[in-house]
Structures are given as C-alpha cells and as structure tokens.
C-alpha cells in the first residue's frame, strides 16, 4: 500500500505516525485494501491527498468533511471533491451555489477541488477511508484520533486560519481550535437535507476572504 504525503507534513506528523493506535490503523487499512480489492476508497495513493496537495505552512482555510464518498470512482482524498470527469455530488453542488451567490462569481463546471487545495485550502475528512456502499464503515478504527490531532496541530502551530465547520460532526471539532488565533465559521451541512438550515446564505466564503485580506494573506479563487 503506497501513500503520498508532502514532505513538510512528514515532519509535522512524525510523532503521530509512530503512535500505537496509528500503527494498528495502518495494519487494519492494509488488510482492508488487500482483502476487499477495489472496494475501499479512495485508492491507497490518494488517502493522504489532502496532505500531499499543499505544504503545512501554506494552509489558509480548513474545511472539515465526514468520510469519503462511498460510490465507485468518487473519492479522491480531498473532502467534498471528485475528479473532473465525475458528476458533481449534491453537497458540492450546494457549496458551489453558495459560492456563486456569496462571491458573485461563476464556479467551474467540475468538482475537482485540487484547484482550491493548491491555493491553501486544506480539505480534510475526519475519516480518510470507506468501504464501497457503506458510509461510516471505517468509523472508530483510529482515523478520528488522527484527524483530531491534525486539527489541534494546525490550531497550535499556525496563525489566522479560517476553519469552516459544516454540520454537527464538523462543529464538534470546535473544541480543538483556539478561537483567539483563528476564525471559526459554523453552519449546517451542505447536504440537500440540511443546506437550507443555514448553509445556503451563510456567506462563509466572503467572510473567509475578508478575514484573509485583514491578515495580509493572498486571496483564494473559489471558482
């Protein structure tokens, strides 16, 4: 099982990678990929795609998702993202809808959010793998411990980051973030079931850009 991760992250996460729970997690995941060939998403090399897409110090915005898409060919290791040839999922359609309304721009006609990641948007799911057709199938195997630590490390070691917490699971991570150092934006999940409960009309993207500008950080193009 080969995974890719950007060099600066290896240093930042070295302690975590050497902890007992993480070694158990890796053992379990390797077994899953080996015994359920083609049924575990994303492909192994993309598990850490969020970490491989931008250096640690370049993070400006953190968007927290739940677990990867569980349909074939959907998950690509970036929360809410799909490859450019894949139909845009409903939650991401609502994200684009909110961006267009809030920022008065036209989003691109594909769901590959690598274009955001390389500008400093860290798109992290709380669980990094899933079995086909079984949402939350890799819950409580260790991923949440790992991603909680990642959020804490970002909060502790970086300054003036925008954290977008959408839905109850993401909002439960608020306690891991220092509110005196960072901007925390909370609302409902962009899923069709809850987008009208606050997400649509939240203006999170315009709030984020204003905050970045106030702290002399380069603008992100959310198209």
From Swiss-Prot:
It comes from the Bacteria. Keywords: Cytoplasm, DNA damage, DNA repair, Hydrolase. InterPro entries: UDG_fam1, Ura-DNA_Glyclase_AS, Uracil-DNA_glycosylase-like, Uracil-DNA_glycosylase-like_sf. It is found in: Cytoplasm. The active site is at residue 67. PROSITE patterns: U_DNA_GLYCOSYLASE. It catalyses: Hydrolyzes single-stranded DNA or mismatched double-stranded DNA and polynucleotides, releasing free uracil. It is an enzyme of class 3 (hydrolase). One of its GO terms (biological process) is base-excision repair, AP site formation via deaminated base removal. Pfam families: UDG. GO terms for cellular component: cytoplasm. SUPFAM superfamilies: Uracil-DNA glycosylase-like. Its EC number is 3.2.2.27. GO terms for molecular function: uracil DNA N-glycosylase activity. Its main location: cytoplasm. Excises uracil residues from the DNA which can arise as a result of misincorporation of dUMP residues by DNA polymerase or due to deamination of cytosine. Belongs to the uracil-DNA glycosylase (UDG) superfamily. UNG family. This is Uracil-DNA glycosylase. The gene is ung.
